Regions:
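Extended, charged alpha-helical "arm/stalk" segments used for dimerization and assembly
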Residues: 101-202
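Extreme N-terminal "head/tail" segments of very large remodeling/mechanoenzyme assemblies
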Residues: 1-141
């Protein structure tokens, strides 16, 4: 069985650097705006292997107004003091999995190379191993794609950085021993749900 153990978020909306520990059963709770959908949307990118904004905020049961750019540049509203707009930076969403059959761990993730001119490039990657202690941060800054490739090559001999999302999805599913992309469509549907607004009706 493959189990999700950790989620690393760097420069993802208002998360500058956060490691989320994951157990067998998890309860994600908090008031509106606490960041529940922000975490789920990040997780979707890695698990679905795509960056389509149509998937964002489905768990909140509201018409999604969120965009990939808004998440990356922390620019969901005006006058946000944490906005990264106009800056060069890197964003990381990385998941560490445990394989209790192979008795090892592996990592699936994506980094976004974001530029001050508004351009961005996504780079999905997979390697056998755990999240590094430095969390892909050197000298206080998240690694750019050049430094990431160098770091992975030096520390994880079988690491792969993929040129296309399709190539990443194919290898990610293979790592899970899944050979049909239909499971990804099922995962999309599973995220959207209707919240409980009347506890008596629920009972």
């Amino acid at each position: 069985m493959k189990k999700l153990k950790k989620i690393l978020l760097i420069n993802w909306l208002y998360f500058s650097k956060e490691i989320i520990e994951v157990g067998d059963v998890n309860f994600l709770t908090g008031k509106n705006g606490a960041g529940k959908s922000t975490v789920i949307d990040a997780l979707q990118i890695v698990l679905l292997g795509e960056t389509n904004a149509r998937n964002f905020n489905l768990a909140a049961n509201e018409r999604s107004q969120r965009t990939l750019d808004g998440y990356l540049r922390a620019d969901m509203d005006e006058n946000n003091p944490y906005s990264r707009r106009g800056k060069d930076f890197s964003t990381y969403i990385v998941c560490e999995f445990e394989d209790d059959v192979e008795h090892n761990s592996f990592v699936c993730g994506v980094m976004f190379d974001c530029r001050s001119d508004g351009s961005k490039h996504d780079h999905f990657f997979i390697y056998v191993g755990k999240l590094p202690e430095n969390c892909f941060v050197e000298d206080g800054e998240a690694m750019d794609i050049h430094d990431l490739r160098k770091f992975l090559k030096q520390n994880f001999s079988r690491a792969e950085v993929y040129d296309t999302q399709w190539e990443y999805r194919r290898n990610m599913l293979s790592r899970w021993n899944v050979h049909n992309e239909q499971v990804l469509r099922m995962m999309k549907k599973a995220v959207s749900f209707r919240p409980i607004v009347d506890i008596q009706q629920f009972i």
